[in-house]
Amino acid sequence: MSDIEKEENKDSSPPTTPPTGGPTKNNDIDDDEKENKIERSLTENLNKRFYNNNNNNSNNSNGEEIEDIDYKNFKTIKEFGYYYNDKGELRSIEGEEKFKFINQQQYDRLGDIIVKTIQNKMKSEPINLEEHWIPKGETNQCNIFTSKDFFENPTKLMVFINGSGAVKSGQWARSLCINDTLNTGSILPYLNDAISNDFSIIVLNPNYNVFEERIIEEGEEQKEKAKEEEEKKDDNGKLLKKKRVDNSIKGSENSNNHILTVYDEFIKKSPAKEIVIVAHSFGGVNTTYLLDNRGEEIADRLKSIAFTDSVHSLSPKSSSFTKSFFADENKTKNWVKSDKKLNTDLGFSKLQGCNIASSGHRVHEFTSSACRVPLFQFILNSLKK
């Protein structure tokens, strides 16, 4: 039995999605609390699966003391002693060993650099996506990616929305990019399939909500400017009171705002007659929010939505368009974690308002890679109707 089936058997009301209309302050708080709760749950489960050691442990698995290293200024995977082989596996330069967790700073910094590695692959042959920093003209920005034909392709567009947490544009699961392969943890295989099927592409970045240092050379100017602002002195040489620096990104203050901003500034301007959405985990909540707030605009062009272990739910506040679109088995499907055979029909979920099927994998992070083949077939079939 999938988690969604178990949840529907509970005697409890489903969480509500935000009401239609633009985002409000109270809605933003509710969304953030919900997103943080899901993120904490996913992170706790992840740590239990991959790590048995304490994050603050100064010894390795052999009981040997580990040198106290400050990883925050590392800028390449090589500095950590690792590289990606031809199979997309992270391996140590010496010994070809799998990643060894030392502490959270090491893991987080390596994860940040791996994001840049994946995004560089997205911008290189054979994928060749273009990077856009939004909003234009602002110091605090986040990046999204589009295919070079995004504003010219008149036929079909594929939209990618990842889940919540530490993942950024180009990733399904950071843990898999580190502990398994880029083929399971990143969206690179999906991008290749989209290109081979002549889709234009846009890859969103819903978790990039505050300005971050751009790894390598980028971001140094903004970093120094912020430092100078904090260290200003008066005429007597006394340090002035530091101003609180707001690093939030306008239009992307939270994941739902990001979705609407990218829709208004990019997706709406695409000439594609047919639009499909692929969304993982909390990306399903963002997709629901998009339909609740831009349903009338996108209705004529939206052909299908493919979820991978989405955590969304519908409520009386969900729009009629969202409910009807999700209820159509030819337009919406959620491939959930399950021990059933890949693509096994698991029926209709009242909680989520859509049909669900087995992803062929029992672990949440693996669902996107596990169901890629039937998911693409579902999308292609939706364009024929």
UniProtKB/Swiss-Prot annotation:
Name used for this protein in its record: Cotranscriptional regulator ARB2A homolog
Top-level taxon in the UniProt lineage: Eukaryota
SUPFAM superfamilies in the record: alpha/beta-Hydrolases
GO cellular component entries: nucleus
One biological process term in Gene Ontology: regulatory ncRNA-mediated heterochromatin formation
Extent of Basic and acidic residues compositional bias: 220-238
Organism: Dictyostelium discoideum
Protein family (similarity comment): Belongs to the ARB2A family.
Disordered: region residues: 1-65, 220-239
Gene3D superfamilies named in the record: alpha/beta hydrolase
PANTHER family: FAM172 FAMILY PROTEIN HOMOLOG CG10038
Compositional bias of kind Low complexity: 52-62
